[in-house]
Curated annotation (Swiss-Prot):
Residue positions binding ATP: K46, G53, R54, G55, E99, A102, E107
Gene Ontology biological process: succinyl-CoA metabolic process; tricarboxylic acid cycle
Subunit structure: Heterotetramer of two alpha and two beta subunits.
TM segment ranges: none
Xref: Pfam families: ATP-grasp_2 (PF08442), Ligase_CoA (PF00549)
Gene behind the chain: sucC
Signal peptide, first to last residue: none
Disulphide bridges: none
Pathway participation: Carbohydrate metabolism; tricarboxylic acid cycle; succinate from succinyl-CoA (ligase route): step 1/1
Name the UniProt record assigns to this protein: Succinate--CoA ligase [ADP-forming] subunit beta
Organism of derivation: Janthinobacterium sp. (strain Marseille) (Minibacterium massiliensis)
Cofactor section: Mg(2+)
Amino acid sequence: MNIHEYQGKEILRKYGVTTPKGFPCFSVDEAVQAAEKLGGKVWVVKAQIHAGGRGKGGGVKVAKSLDEVRKYANDILGMTLVTHQTGPEGRLVKRLLIEEGADIKKELYVGMVVDRGSQRVALMASSEGGMDIEHVAEHTPEKIHKVFIDPVKGLLDSEADDIARKIGVPEGSIGQARAFMQGLYKAFDETDASLAEINPLIVTGDDRIVALDAKFNFDSNAMYRHPEIQEMRDLDEEDPAEIEASKFDLTYISLDGNIGCLVNGAGLAMATMDVIKLYGGSPANFLDVGGGATTEKVTEAFKIMLKNPDIKAILVNIFGGIMKCDVIAQGVIAAAKQVDLTVPLVVRMAGTNEELGKKILAESGLPIITANNMAEAAEKVVNAAQGK
């Protein structure tokens, strides 16, 4: 689950992390009132969407008068902001963050992720903060420093101080940087975050350490423990198909291809997409129906996939372990009839009651294309999507 920048900063402040003063706003008038309340002579008008690259996309503006605050708020609110993370369709901006301006002497980068290899939280930091951290990671990875945090000991003072020095924090600000990193780690750990990114973390003209931006992702499976974070969820920022899928305990992620995939098990689903790509196709989605798929769930899965106008064919790939192939076959047939399926359907199933499942499909009277293995299934669905 993702949240907005201003919400991430609310969390950080609870853990003692310094952020600029600011207010979320939903209208131009609110934006001007927020600037008046903040005082000062410089304000930053920031689009609030669940995507990075807002500055490059024109979603972050520095205003030096209240008239400019009004102008930029009017320009940004309601705009479709396109960044490298939104895709070409962009995101509609429905809320802003108005913040006090900052005296930036140096921009740094600090992030945390769960590192599966070390089975620890990895802290990553770089002296090259700001909008081009992706470029740094790709072209000069040696400028990114890492420490893998022991979950028992936490982030040690010595580890934080070492990282701070490596990224160029002034000696007089090392203590602040240490407190920031330890506060960020505590926030990350206690909120069940999967990613936290501060880009940029700045050193101000008077050598204060301030989190100028904040990005958080959380483990959706842990949100039952954090109702206060769950309340921050912005459904307007999420794919309607993914929201609908979650109502039926389906794990669905939209992609940009034209072959719908319905699979049981996340590993098999990823392998299925890989094989489709291997045979020259492009998956339109990741869809895991789980181990207890019912006819209703399969039907809803078909409905969700078919809302995508780009879909040219569907591949159902099932391994019958907990789930029996005959039950899936009946669900596929019922779903195909209920949604009035008009695109080619390829089904590959193996495992419990496999032969019975294939028999049910063969006797259904529906133009279902069957396959005996994944390679054959991928080849057939790619050909079907191409009209061959």
